[in-house]
From Swiss-Prot:
Residues 252-276 have a biased composition (Basic residues). Belongs to the universal ribosomal protein uL2 family. The gene is rplB. GO terms for biological process: cytoplasmic translation. Residues 221-276 are annotated as: Disordered. The keyword DNA-binding does not apply. PANTHER family: LARGE RIBOSOMAL SUBUNIT PROTEIN UL2M (PTHR13691:SF5), RIBOSOMAL PROTEIN L2 (PTHR13691). This is Large ribosomal subunit protein uL2. The lineage of its organism: Bacteria, Bacillati, Mycoplasmatota, Mollicutes, Acholeplasmatales.
């Protein structure tokens, strides 16, 4: 994916860049695969904020994505490559020979007219989906299941992928982009290739307004707040935080503290922790 850079004709355009959308083949999504989606603005079912700095943004319809890839041994043809406002990756509309249409995540190298298929004995080609036990060691994969039949949960964002490094009994060892090495059941499915739109991380939004379009609200420093709002707040002028170490808004130590539950069951499947 190419990046389009703007000339600094205004302060908002200075250093701003956007996707050139050179891979996109249509701007009209498949209506049968669209559903309404209400923005939760970072709230849970009790109305409490669980994710800060969320809210507003433009309205958008949700595209139903086939993460399970369970339509076995039926050939599908890539009809379009489309933009999805709900994720960083592009999506591809697949027309299957039996008449069904589905969206999948668009991997790097997938083009209109290519044929894809899912199944246990599928060829090792980009966008084909099959169990990890049937994929050769060293292959790059994405959209990987953690539980058989649940659908892909790992490596779904733009430019992401994992590499199969070995097999052990009923498990396959994967190296994630973070550097983590973990076991996954060999019966879990994965899709061949790397997610496309890999230049997404190079986009510079240029101004706060573009982040607001995405539903991202401002992040206020704790030291700029009052003492009843944040442990760093209060004081005269630019006062220090007054603590031995930085704190979260809820008074717990921040930075360098491990937050993963030591009793989490999946800890036994992680061979090497991710790089810091």
């Amino acid at each position: 994916m190419a990046i389009k850079k703007y000339k600094p004709t205004t302060n908002g355009c200075r250093n701003m860049s956007v996707s050139a959308f050179s891979e996109i083949t249509t701007q009209t999504p498949e209506r049968s695969l669209l559903v309404s989606h209400k923005d939760q603005a970072g709230r849970n079912n009790q109305g409490k904020i669980t994710v800060r700095h969320r809210g507003g943004g433009v309205k958008r319809k949700y595209r139903l994505i086939d993460f399970k890839r369970n339509k076995d041994n039926i050939v599908g043809k890539v009809a379009t490559i489309e933009y999805d406002p709900n994720r960083s990756a592009n999506i591809a509309l697949i027309h299957y020979v039996d008449g069904e249409k589905r969206y999948i995540l668009a991997p790097k190298g997938l083009t209109v007219g290519m044929q894809i298929v899912s199944g246990k004995e599928t060829d090792i080609k980009v966008a084909n989906c099959l169990p990890l036990m049937n994929i050769p060691v060293g292959t790059t994969v994405h959209n990987i299941e953690l539980k058989p039949g649940k659908g892909g949960q790992i490596a779904r964002s733009a430019g992401s992928s994992c590499q199969i490094i070995s097999r052990e009994d009923k498990y396959v060892l994967l190296r994630l982009q973070s550097g983590e090495v973990r076991k996954v059941l060999a019966t879990c499915r994965a899709t061949i290739g790397e997610i496309g739109n890999e230049s997404y991380k190079l986009i510079n939004y240029g101004k706060a307004g573009k982040k607001r379009f995405l539903g991202i609200r401002p992040t206020v420093r704790g030291s700029a707040m009052n003492p009843n709002d944040h442990p760093h707040g209060g004081g005269e002028g630019r006062a220090p935080i007054g603590r031995k170490s930085p704190m979260t808004p809820w008074g717990k130590k921040a930075r360098g503290v491990k937050t993963r539950d030591r009793k989490k069951a999946s800890n036994a499947l992680i061979i090497r922790r991710r790089k810091k």
